[in-house]
Amino acid sequence: MGAHHPALGLLLLLLCPAQVFSQSCVWYGECGIATGDKRYNCKYSGPPKPLPKDGYDLVQELCPGLFFDNVSLCCDIQQLQTLKSNLQLPLQFLSRCPSCFYNLMTLFCELTCSPHQSQFLNVTATEDYFDPKTQENKTNVKELEYFVGQSFANAMYNACRDVEAPSSNEKALGLLCGRDARACNATNWIEYMFNKDNGQAPFTIIPVFSDLSILGMEPMRNATKGCNESVDEVTGPCSCQDCSIVCGPKPQPPPPPMPWRIWGLDAMYVIMWVTYVAFLFVFFGALLAVWCHRRRYFVSEYTPIDSNIAFSVNSSDKGEASCCDPLGAAFDDCLRRMFTKWGAFCVRNPTCIIFFSLAFITVCSSGLVFVQVTTNPVELWSAPHSQARLEKEYFDKHFGPFFRTEQLIIQAPNTSVHIYEPYPAGADVPFGPPLNKEILHQVLDLQIAIESITASYNNETVTLQDICVAPLSPYNKNCTIMSVLNYFQNSHAVLDSQVGDDFYIYADYHTHFLYCVRAPASLNDTSLLHGPCLGTFGGPVFPWLVLGGYDDQNYNNATALVITFPVNNYYNDTERLQRAWAWEKEFISFVKNYKNPNLTISFTAERSIEDELNRESNSDVFTVIISYVVMFLYISLALGHIQSCSRLLVDSKISLGIAGILIVLSSVACSLGIFSYMGMPLTLIVIEVIPFLVLAVGVDNIFILVQTYQRDERLQEETLDQQLGRILGEVAPTMFLSSFSETSAFFFGALSSMPAVHTFSLFAGMAVLIDFLLQITCFVSLLGLDIKRQEKNHLDILCCVRGADDGQGSHASESYLFRFFKNYFAPLLLKDWLRPIVVAVFVGVLSFSVAVVNKVDIGLDQSLSMPNDSYVIDYFKSLAQYLHSGPPVYFVLEEGYNYSSRKGQNMVCGGMGCDNDSLVQQIFNAAELDTYTRVGFAPSSWIDDYFDWVSPQSSCCRLYNVTHQFCNASVMDPTCVRCRPLTPEGKQRPQGKEFMKFLPMFLSDNPNPKCGKGGHAAYGSAVNIVGDDTYIGATYFMTYHTILKTSADYTDAMKKARLIASNITETMRSKGSDYRVFPYSVFYVFYEQYLTIIDDTIFNLSVSLGSIFLVTLVVLGCELWSAVIMCITIAMILVNMFGVMWLWGISLNAVSLVNLVMSCGISVEFCSHITRAFTMSTKGSRVSRAEEALAHMGSSVFSGITLTKFGGIVVLAFAKSQIFEIFYFRMYLAMVLLGATHGLIFLPVLLSYIGPSVNKAKRHTTYERYRGTERERLLNF
């Protein structure tokens, strides 16, 4: 038997520890001070000790799994209190998912108090300690190993990895793991929590992960709860937002629309190509058929084409008048008689007419005294009752206007990338040029200098402190500065801080930066520096807002720093707003003059765009003036009809041209004055565009009137007033047609809700109407006076000086341009072989334009609105190149919603027990599809953070037990007690009056290391509490858009945000809540127009064309087909304008839409005169009538509009403003060239083919009127 004793002894030694481990401790109680107020635990190897009964509540709160039998534990009450204190930060972020926090508490409860500690804890370092209170020698536990089951660690991590931190828009583990949430895993998370360098652990705990026994140690493998499981009967599983497996399949975006293709090619190209070829086939086939048919009837091809043989496209119009012909003839005769009498009256009574005209002009233009010019971009681009404008007003009223932004984007072009080598080991980390410490010091100097800028307003000094956003004021008056330097508390000393020795640097600004970009809301980093990341203003500084040019989320690779100074905006408080303007002016001046060869700075202030728009308008005044001078000179010289050098100063009409121009400008002034009387403000687009438009319309009428007189012979026995009356009777109807068509088109265009189009249309319509009235009154009288001067041989301008009498006198003659049109251009254009070519070319161009009309870009590049030399252009470029986050977007829930009921809470919140289709959850789901929805991050949710804050397990919500006033978590006062009891009822969410009782406390609580959930900084402005803190008004839930670079991006972001909000609203309504959710971002008011720009364009152009059609139909005396042909031609011009816009890179927006509406009006000038001349012609065939119309009206249209406008437009090409060069020079040039070619080439050809038949009643009336006079011979041309 003795031989077996050694083996038996060894077996007993192996078995005995197992028996000891079953109920054995490694520590009990607290001993010496470790760091700060943290203590070591006392080493103890005995059995667990019964917990005093006054600690029962605490163990039930923290470790209910250990509350059994006589509650014998390996910890005392002080250790439990320390555990509670150390777990406050994880509690605040993880308690929203009970199963996650349950597993975490299991890990720490087993570590701190488990009666089986010795199974999985192994003390590896101790030191002696003398307790001065008990006068006993004890042993501090300085280090130990914690054997944790790998499966337990993985299960705990899996339950927590999806938990959100609503106030910081990121995963909670990103704040608790010491690294980015994406890099966090089960092992490095637990290692971080047990590392004494994290600021919470008093000593080092080395976790050892294994599911198998190691060296006789049994890993802690307690049961865990999945995030989709309930912890107890009171709490439910975690929400979808905090537990992805609860959500089911991840939502998928709808597939992008497939491009419309036919045979692998763009469908529009194919369709229009096929259509064009088919048209050519039909058109030329019809011509060939007619030609062959005519060959059967004509003896020779030289037989006159103006025969009435059947099927002739040029057949003459014989036969009886139709039923509408007499009506048209009567109406035309009525107009002719009325204008004839009026013209004669004006010539006979020039003094009276001119006096009343001047009086009218004076009265109307005096309204300019009350003129208001709108430069506010919101007023310019957003309709007062548009959805975006109303939502902006609602947001501003309830939460205050969105803050003013002063922003700098800084690069370090002369600095290279440097490499940081972490201690003691790890991969090298590259740091971008601007993250060089010397550069950071220089940027900090700049930032401090900007903070020191002062301005003067009303003899008061204005500083940044006076106007900045300070969310924790008055407790913390530091301004919000979104800058990477806020990670270093905006301090040179903190930036230079480092921990190391003579050989190594253990921690410096690199380590602090790497931690803070992962946990921007942290109050204590994990390095030896232990510095806060939270900004000095009390809020987090998110890396995507202060860094630019990095890849993915590697913030250390940043190539740009972004510094933003949010400044308070004010709702209906002009006085305080002017203070901000004054400071911004000094800010702009300072940064413009700042010199540092190591830094490249792009910047903007809130007022920058408005300032630059004003500067742009002023800088291009000279260009616009030159443009008008060129047109004035041309008009003044071209009106004269010089017959000989000796009569140069007599026959010139410079004074008449100047008078005509002044009449045009007076009509503009009258229009501005009339609407200024009404209190309607002007816009820059009105001032810049309308004179151009009215000059085109007015000059054309002047040329028609003057040139008709110059070609006219005075009849026998006819006086001057009778002659001018007769001439006005002939041409005034066509002037009336064009002017009234344009006036109607513009006034109907004012139905548009777009402010730019609405205002322009009203002012333009009134200006054109007044211009017409002044031309048939004042100008006719002036023309009569000028003719009398000419007949008396007096010099132009110097009208009192009589010229030499050469005996020639003035007589009617044809100008060179008229003879060119009559003898060469018109006959050539209407040749049988050329007309088909003209039709083919113009229809081809039309087909191309239709094919590309859907490819015109929509929007307005912001940089185009700035002068070429503007500093804001550099800012826009840097914005697109470097920034990685878009503007903030607020989902606003309108006032009246019931947050105090469980049902109401569930429809909004995103935590445990909340609906899977709640407001927060739907925004969270949208952020998961950020490339589609353009929502970049999960929303910050005040209600979820409030529930965590008010939870009885948290140390955040406490009251003084005597006064019942709020007690901040940082206050160490034994009279402070938790707000709600630690009972099953207390653990439930507050409802009813209790919900409102603690909410104001939450919104006024500043975050601190003991409670990071204080809502003052994050939610102080997010919740309206009204009715003396009795109920909640409007609230918002904020997130950020993804980076937006183009107009299409901005428009799509707004569209998707509205879709999300609409879905939330519909979901709430389906559950009985009739309150609306809408999104708001600062740019919505500017980009809303692009959501409907296509519909607005179709509406405005259709209304304009429709009104032109109706006026033309009436004025031409029910000539239906003439009105149709004219509108077809104008429509072709408009479609071709879209083709030019696509070719020339002109986008569709409010500015280009105004120009399109204007081009519709100017097209009338090119088409209406020739169309009416065609209908009035009594020639025998369509070709002859088209030739006569083109010869007589073409020269006036060409000289009156085309040449006048062309000279002025060319000058605009030299404008400094990009918006002038693109939207005015390019579009004006296009509309003049397209109008001229269609009006002078295509329209006559079209009329020669399908023009209306001659009005028999008009022909009869005309013959009867001129029978027996010398004008009878002119009827046959």
Curated annotation (Swiss-Prot):
Q: Where is this region: Important for cholesterol binding and cholesterol transfer from NPC1 to liposomes?
A: 175-205
Lumenal-side positions: 23-269, 372-621, 675-683, 752-759, 854-1097, 1145, 1216-1226
**Protein name listed in UniProt:** NPC intracellular cholesterol transporter 1
**Pfam families in the record:** NPC1_MLD, NPC1_N, Sterol-sensing
PANTHER family named among the record's database cross-references: NPC INTRACELLULAR CHOLESTEROL TRANSPORTER 1
Q: Which SUPFAM superfamilies match?
A: Multidrug efflux transporter AcrB transmembrane domain
Assembly and binders:
Interacts (via the second lumenal domain) with NPC2. Interacts with TMEM97; the interaction may decrease NPC1 availability to the cell. Interacts with TIM1. Interacts with SLC38A9; this interaction inhibits cholesterol-mediated mTORC1 activation via its sterol transport activity.
Q: Which PROSITE patterns match?
A: SSD
**Listed transmembrane segments:** 270-290, 351-371, 622-642, 654-674, 684-704, 731-751, 760-780, 833-853, 1098-1118, 1124-1144, 1146-1166, 1195-1215, 1227-1247
- Assigned GO CC terms: endoplasmic reticulum; endosome; extracellular region; Golgi apparatus; late endosome membrane; lysosomal membrane; lysosome; membrane
Recorded family membership: Belongs to the patched family.
By its UniProt entry, which Gene3D superfamilies does this protein fall under?
Multidrug efflux transporter AcrB transmembrane domain (1.20.1640.10)
Residues of the region (Required for location in lysosomes) are: 1274-1277
Classification of source organism: Eukaryota, Metazoa, Chordata, Craniata, Vertebrata
Q: Where is the signal peptide?
A: 1-22
Q: Where does cholesterol bind?
A: 41, 79
Carbohydrate-modified residues are: 70, 122, 137, 185, 222, 228, 414, 459, 478, 524, 868, 898, 916, 961, 968, 1063
Q: Which cysteines are joined by disulfide bonds?
A: 25-74, 31-42, 63-109, 75-113, 97-238, 100-160, 177-184, 227-243, 240-247, 468-479, 516-533, 909-914, 956-1011, 957-979, 967-976
Q: In which tissues is it expressed?
A: Detected in liver (at protein level). Ubiquitous. Detected in adult heart, spleen, lung, liver, skeletal muscle, kidney, testis.
Can you state which reaction this protein catalyses? cholesterol(in) = cholesterol(out)
* Domain comment (free text): A cysteine-rich N-terminal domain and a C-terminal domain containing a di-leucine motif necessary for lysosomal targeting are critical for mobilization of cholesterol from lysosomes.
Q: Domain named SSD: which ranges?
A: 620-785
The way it spans or sits in the membrane comes to:
Multi-pass membrane protein
Q: Tell me the name of the encoding gene.
A: Npc1
Task: Kindly report every residue range on the membrane side named Cytoplasmic.
Answer: 291-350, 643-653, 705-730, 781-832, 1119-1123, 1167-1194, 1248-1277
